[in-house]
Amino acid sequence: MAKTSMKKMLEAGVHFGHRSRFWSPKMGRFIYGTRNGVHIINLEKTLPLFNDALNFASKITAVGRSILFVGTKRAASNIIKQEAMRCGMPYVNHRWLGGMMTNYKTIKVSIKRLKDLEFLAEENFNQFGKKEALMMTREMEKLERSLGGIKDLNDIPDVIFVIDIGVEKNAVAEAKKLHLPIIGIVDTNHSPEGIDYVIPGNDDSIRAIGYYAREIANAILEAKAATSTSIEKKVSVKKLETKKPGSKKTPIEQVPAKEEIIKTSIKEDKPETLNKIALNTMKKADLIAYAETQGVTINSTDTKAQTIEKLA
C-alpha cells in the first residue's frame, strides 16, 4: 500500500500556500494559519488525503488503467515529463489543446500525422526538397511538443493527475465533462470543488511539484511490480500443477494418442513376417507351424506352393 510521510512533505515545502489576500474561502478548512502574510497549509489534513490519492493511483494501475500527468507551467513541465516517462504513463507538459479529451477523434488525426512524420524522419527527410524538409521538421517538432506525451494512447485516459488546477482549468473542465476522476494539487488560492482527490499543497515550488509527481509515479511503479509478480506466481503454480504426478493437467504432448499405443502394442506382439524366399527353404510341417503363429488357416489338401502363397 503506497504511503507518504509528514517529513517528506515538510522537506518539500508542501505547507507553503499563497499570500493571504489571494486565498479562496473554500480552502479555509485546510489552512493552519498565516505567517508573514502567507497562508500555511495544515499538513495533518494533507497527509491522509495524499495517501488516499496514492492508493487510488495504485488501484487504477493494478487493473491496467492509465493516468494522464498534466503540468504545463514552466516549474512543472520537465518534472511531469520525466516522472510520467519513468512510470510509463502519458503526459501533457507543453500546452493543453482544446478538445484533447472531449474531441479525441480529431486529436488522433494529429497524432497519426506526427507518427507519419517521425517515420519519414527515420527514412531521411533529405529525399525531399530543402524547403519542404525544413517545413516538415518544424511541423513534427510542434506536434511533438503538444502531443508527444500522448501519442501512444489508444483512447482517452482513465484518470488525470493535475499539478495546478487553476493553470490547467481546461484540462479539469474536460475531465469533468467526461466524468473522469481527477487527482489535483490545490493551493490556497483555488477552490477544491469538483476535484475527486484533493491534495492541499504548494503548487508553485519546483521541489514540491517534484515531490508530488515522484510519489504518484512511485505508487504506479509499485502497483505494476506487484501485478507482474502476481502474474508470474500464477504461471509458476500452473507449471507445477502440470508436472504433478496423476494431475489432470498433464500436457497433451506428453500423453501418446490412444491409437498410437494400440498400434505400438500390435507391432510388438505380432511376430515378424517372412518373405517368399525364406518360406521356400522351409519344410511343409514347419510352414504349417509358422502359419499358426500368423493366424493363417492351412488345409490338409494344400500343397506347399499354395501354403506359401497364403503366407506371403
From Swiss-Prot:
Coiled coil: none annotated. PROSITE patterns: RIBOSOMAL_S2_1, RIBOSOMAL_S2_2. GO terms for biological process: translation. The keyword Ribosomal protein applies. GO terms for molecular function: structural constituent of ribosome. Gene3D superfamilies: Glucose-6-phosphate isomerase like protein, domain 1, Helix hairpin bin. GO terms for cellular component: cytosolic small ribosomal subunit. Pfam families: Ribosomal_S2. Keywords: Ribonucleoprotein, Ribosomal protein. Belongs to the universal ribosomal protein uS2 family. NCBIfam families: rpsB_bact. This is Small ribosomal subunit protein uS2.
